[in-house]
Amino acid sequence: MSKALNFLAGVVILAILLAQAQTTEATQAGASKPAANTNGFVVDLQKHWTTAQGLAVAVAEAMPAADYSFKPVPEEMSFGEQIMHIAEANYGYCAFLTDAKSPFVDLAKDAKIEKAEAVKQLTGSFEYCSAAFSKVTEAELDAVHGTGDHKFVARDVMLGVMIHMVHHRGQAEVYLRLKGIKPPDYKW
């Protein structure tokens, strides 16, 4: 299974590199450039976060409740653990962003993860982050959060939560495929 996951990751990276090469080639060939973005980083991130929420929740809902304990190999998290991990990390990153304590409560720790609870936690974590993002102004993007060795600017925290979530959602999509379930289609 690990080889299949590594192969899939390699295919995704290759596709990204090919797309970047085509974009560079088109730009060098004199293709028209898109209009300058005047929305600002926070507005743009919020738009993509909303899309990501829909995709992540759709992935969580696609797996039958009976398969939430499915693990492709023993050393991996179960599907339910992946979903709860996304929720916990979302809460953690966004609490860090607002200098607050994470409201995440791991009700499933050392217990069977129920689908309904996992989807509820996941949805709540996206809403929590959306509210946290809306409190950050463009002027505050370079504000430092954290203490000691754990200091990050707001922009890094916001990008970090997105990257972390996408990484684990991608893993969850592979779990769906391994169970013979087509993951939800990507929506822009």
What is each residue range found by the language model?
Residues N6-Q20:
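Bacterial N-terminal signal peptides
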Residues Q46-T50, G54-V57, D67-L107, G146-W188:
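Short, contiguous alpha-helical
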Residues V59, A111-G146, V153-V166:
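Acidic/histidine-rich alpha-helical segments that form the ligand environment
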